[in-house]
Design a protein with these regions (language model features):
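Inter-lobe coupling/hinge segments of SF2-like helicase ATPases
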Residues: 47, 61, 65, 73-76, ...
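Upstream accessory/linker segments immediately N-terminal to the RecA-like ATPase cores of bacterial MutS
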Residues: 1-70
Length: 317
């Protein structure tokens, strides 16, 4: 079970073999359920969206960057899926910064202009807030209400959001696994966008199966796991790949070097001087404060923060 320590079995017993057999049986059941779901979706009729409205055209024209060829191709494929009879189930693969979020925003707005609600499911609280700000800013000039749900929204604020969602006053809701909770009720859900589906646990995916049966689904990922790709390759899911980087984007440089304080100082100083941020990954919580102190000593002007899995939600935020 996720979130619990594995049980140690006594040697010379059949306990481990029994556990393996149960796991194999459960995996087969899940695989069969998924295949049934995808077969049902392929053979069922979903909502057929209307051709693009003038608002859709205005939204896409207001994009401040030039669309890449793969962005245009993926957007067109998604529109054809949404305007078709069968429920959409498309996987969009692309590196970070290659424009997947813009594609998702266009798909979401297309659903909204046909009076449908959109759920955007993300794996982390911080990402839900980032997406909320991005969607809200991008759609601020259009008739579209965007809101969010995560563990930081509680009390009256959460109750109000849930009521607005059920009444249909919210067009796009962005959230973590809380979006598949028992209290969530949609008036007219038409599109589900899932960001990095492989990062969700089994319990969330089981709930997703019931939601996805008759709803268009768009999955975004930068790192698809083999099973996700396999579903696309076998035809259960349609696949769009974004390979072309945005104009003037430099490729990511990866260097492997021995630990050296001068290299760390120079790299951090350079990034800060150009207005950027640095993500320094350390592999032990026990001495992470000492590492933060080292960075502060090397680059006195830097503002250094610490984040790890033993901090509570408020501290991380």
């Amino acid at each position: 079970k996720e979130g619990t320590a594995p049980k140690i079995h006594r040697l010379g017993t059949n306990a481990w073999q029994n556990t393996k057999n149960k796991t194999k049986t459960r995996v087969k059941e899940i695989a069969f359920d998924l295949l049934q779901l995808y077969a049902k979706r392929k053979n069922s009729k979903g909502f057929q969206y209307s051709p693009d409205t003038y608002l859709q055209t205005e939204l896409e024209a207001s994009f401040m960057y030039e669309d890449t060829p793969d962005q245009l191709t993926s957007t067109q494929a998604i529109k054809e899926d949404m305007e078709g009879e069968a429920p959409m189930d498309r996987l969009v693969c692309g590196d970070v910064g290659f424009g997947k979020t813009e594609i998702a925003i266009r798909a979401a707005f297309k659903a909204v202009t046909d009076s449908k609600q959109v759920a955007v499911l993300v794996p982390t609280t911080i990402l839900s807030l980032q997406h909320f700000k991005t969607f809200k800013e991008r759609l601020k000039e259009f008739p579209c209400k965007v809101s969010y749900i995560n563990r930081f929204k509680t009390g009256k604020s959460l109750t109000q959001t849930l009521k607005e969602l059920e009444d249909g006053d919210i067009d796009i809701i962005i959230g973590t696994h809380a979006l598949v909770g028992k209290r969530i009720k949609f008036k007219n859900l038409g599109l589900m966008i899932i960001d990095e589906e492989q990062k969700f646990g089994v319990a969330v995916k089981d709930k997703l199966k019931t939601l996805k049966a008759n709803v268009d689904t768009l999955t975004l990922t930068a790192t698809p796991i083999p099973r996700t790709l396999q579903f696309s390759l076998m035809g259960a899911r349609d696949l769009s790949i974004i390979n072309t980087p945005p104009p003037n984007r430099y490729p990511v440089e990866t260097e492997l070097r021995p630990f050296n304080e001068e290299v760390i100082r120079d790299a951090v100083s350079y990034e800060i001087s150009r207005g950027g941020q640095v993500y320094f990954v350390h592999n032990r919580i026990g001495n992470i404060k000492e590492v933060a102190g080292m960075i502060q000593r090397l680059v006195p002007d830097a503002r250094v923060g610490i984040g790890h899995g033993q901090l509570n939600g408020e501290q991380l935020e």
